[in-house]
Curated annotation (Swiss-Prot):
Upper taxonomic lineage: Bacteria, Bacillati, Bacillota, Clostridia, Peptostreptococcales
General function of this protein: Modulates transcription in response to changes in cellular NADH/NAD(+) redox state.
A GO BP annotation: response to redox state
Cellular compartments annotated: Cytoplasm
Protein name: Redox-sensing transcriptional repressor Rex
SUPFAM superfamilies tied to this protein: NAD(P)-binding Rossmann-fold domains, Winged helix' DNA-binding domain
UniProt xrefs under Pfam families: CoA_binding, Put_DNA-bind_N
C-alpha cells in the first residue's frame, strides 16, 4: 500500500497539510473527526479528502469518521516520518541560519548534524550548537555520519557542483533552496523550494483579488 508509485504528486503534496492539521487537532485533544469537518478546516472538499486517503486504503468508518490519532500516525508513516533523518546544511548565510535555528525540524525527526560554508568568514562561526565547517570537508562528513539529506542554501552559481559532490558521497535526498533546477542521477530525490516563485504567486493572487 505504501509503495504505490502511481499516486499523483498532487495527492502527495496534500498529505503534509493533512498531517499538520491532524496534529493541531490532537493538540486540542480532538479524537474524532468527519471528512466534512476536516474539509471545513483544511479547505479541500470532503470528497477530495476521501479520494486522497483511499489511495492508501482508506482510514475512515461509515458513521464514525476518522480517528484523529490513528490517521495522523498513518499519514506520518506514508510520509516516511516513522524514522529519523540526518541532514547536513550547505550555506550558512541568513537563510541557512534561519533553517538551522528552526526547532520544528528536529521535533519532526529531521536532525541537522552540521553546517558547511565555503566562505572563510563564515567558517568557525557558531550557529546554535554548531561550528560552521569548511565545505572542503563535506564529503568526508557525509560518509562518516550516515547522512540522508543535504539542505542547499547557496546561490545558483556552484550549486550543481555541490550537488554532484554530495550525491557522490552517498546523499539520496536534497532539499534545494538554490534557484536552479539541479541535475541528479536516477535514485536521488530533489525537492526544490523557490521562494521567488512563491512570492510571484502571491503577487498574482493579490492582483486578481483572490
Amino acid at each position: 500500500m505504501l509503495g504505490n508509485k502511481n499516486i499523483s504528486m498532487a495527492v502527495i503534496r496534500r498529505l503534509p497539510k493533512y498531517h499538520r492539521y491532524l496534529g493541531d487537532l490532537l493538540d486540542r485533544d480532538i479524537q474524532r473527526i468527519s471528512s466534512k469537518e476536516l474539509s471545513d478546516i483544511i479547505g479541500f472538499t470532503a470528497s477530495q479528502i476521501r479520494q486522497d486517503l483511499n489511495n492508501f486504503g482508506g482510514f475512515g468508518q461509515q458513521g464514525y469518521g476518522y480517528n484523529v490519532e490513528a490517521l495522523h500516525t498513518e499519514i506520518g508513516k506514508i510520509l516516511g516520518l516513522d524514522r529519523p533523518y540526518n541532514a547536513v546544511l550547505v550555506g550558512a548565510g541568513n537563510l541557512g541560519q534561519a533553517i538551522a535555528n528552526y526547532a520544528g525540524f528536529r521535533k519532526a525527526g529531521f536532525e541537522i548534524k552540521a553546517l558547511f560554508d565555503a566562505n572563510p568568514r563564515m567558517i568557525g562561526l557558531k550557529i546554535r550548537e554548531f561550528e560552521v565547517l569548511d565545505s572542503d570537508t563535506l564529503e568526508d562528513f557525509i560518509k562518516n555520519n550516515n547522512i540522508d539529506i543535504a539542505v542547499l542554501c547557496i546561490p545558483k552559481n556552484g550549486a550543481q557542483e555541490v550537488i554532484n559532490r554530495v550525491v557522490k558521497a552517498g546523499i539520496k535526498g536534497v532539499w534545494n533552496f538554490a534557484p536552479l533546477d539541479l541535475e541528479v542521477p536516477k535514485g536521488v530525490i530533489v525537492e526544490n523550494v523557490n521562494l521567488t516563485e512563491s512570492l510571484f504567486t502571491l503577487s498574482y493572487l493579490m492582483k486578481e483579488g483572490k
